[in-house]
């Protein structure tokens, strides 16, 4: 199958491309470097001609509602419009477990993405995933203030990004099914503990300070709103195993220096 991967240069998208290739598919990456601008729509229609399916793994790094909603709305509209015009038979999109219960900026963008997908003209499948293991590093990068890392109170059930990518690739072949079973990892952990583990594994000495978002949003994040409350697909890789890999990489890098 010829499968277009939107966001194919990002963390998840690269893994989706790899998974599709291993399954014998022909993935093509939709990216500015290939003359495709998903936010403006330039080049999207032409890039989708001849494609059997599209995987939407696009992402934006923001915690604010307006840029998140604007990004996911524009990208989703352009992808769905291009896919419909090109006769693409299936669009597979990834979202987040808990997107319905957390009224938080980024989540509102993903919620809008889901709404457009469900009301579009192209047959679709939606996979909701919990936070990826790599999210701990993103929190450190975004919440670091010198020797301190500010971490929101979040109860998570993190999953390996590679396992989510493999699931997306399989869903392409399964055909449109609407909302698929969500995927989550095997451990339930607080985000503060995840960040502390990440800091230890990467050899960083920094203090973790937790805070709670106000209102119902903060309560939902802290008390299980990001955990599946329905049957789900269980990932195999633990967060501890992910940290062990990071520690080995850090030691190897240190020995090379």
Q: Residue locations for each model-derived region?
A:
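Mid/C-terminal beta-alpha module of Rossmann-like enzyme folds, strongest
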Residues: 10-11, 19, 162-257
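Short-chain dehydrogenase/reductase
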Residues: 6, 69-73, 103-111, 154-162, ...
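N-terminal Rossmann NAD(P)H-binding glycine-rich loop of SDR-like oxidoreductase domains
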Residues: 1-24
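Conserved beta-loop-beta element that borders a ligand/cofactor-binding pocket
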Residues: 87, 95, 100, 112-135, ...
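SDR active-site strand-loop-helix element
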Residues: 6, 30, 57-58, 91-96, ...
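A conserved pocket-lining segment of Rossmann-fold NAD(P)-dependent short-chain dehydrogenase/reductase
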Residues: 125, 138-159, 163
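NAD(P)H-binding glycine-rich loop region in Rossmannoid oxidoreductase-like domains
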Residues: 25-86, 96-102
């Amino acid at each position: 199958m010829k499968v277009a991967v939107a966001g194919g240069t990002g963390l998840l998208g690269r893994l989706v491309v790899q998974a599709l290739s291993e399954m014998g598919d022909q993935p093509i990456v939709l990216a500015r470097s290939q003359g495709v601008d998903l936010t403006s729509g330039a080049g999207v229609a032409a890039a989708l001609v001849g494609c059997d399916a599209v995987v939407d793994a696009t992402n934006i790094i923001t915690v604010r509602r307006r840029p998140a909603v604007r990004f996911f709305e524009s990208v989703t509209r352009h992808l769905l419009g291009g896919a419909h015009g090109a006769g693409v038979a299936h669009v597979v999109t990834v979202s987040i477990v808990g997107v319905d219960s957390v009224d938080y900026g980024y989540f509102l963008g993903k919620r809008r993405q889901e709404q457009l997908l469900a009301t579009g003209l192209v047959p679709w499948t939606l996979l909701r995933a919990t936070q990826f293991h790599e999210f701990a590093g993103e929190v450190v990068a975004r919440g670091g203030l010198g020797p301190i890392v500010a971490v929101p109170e979040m109860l998570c059930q993190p999953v390996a990004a590679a396992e989510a990518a493999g699931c997306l690739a399989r869903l392409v072949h399964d055909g449109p099914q609407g909302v698929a079973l969500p995927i989550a990892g095997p451990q339930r952990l607080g985000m503060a503990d995840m960040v502390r583990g990440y800091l230890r594994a990467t050899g960083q000495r920094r203090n973790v300070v937790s805070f709670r978002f106000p209102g119902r949003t903060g309560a939902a994040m802290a008390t299980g709103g990001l955990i599946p409350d329905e049957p789900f697909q269980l990932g195999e890789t633990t967060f501890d195993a992910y940290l062990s890999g990071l520690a080995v990489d850090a030691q190897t890098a240190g020995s090379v220096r």
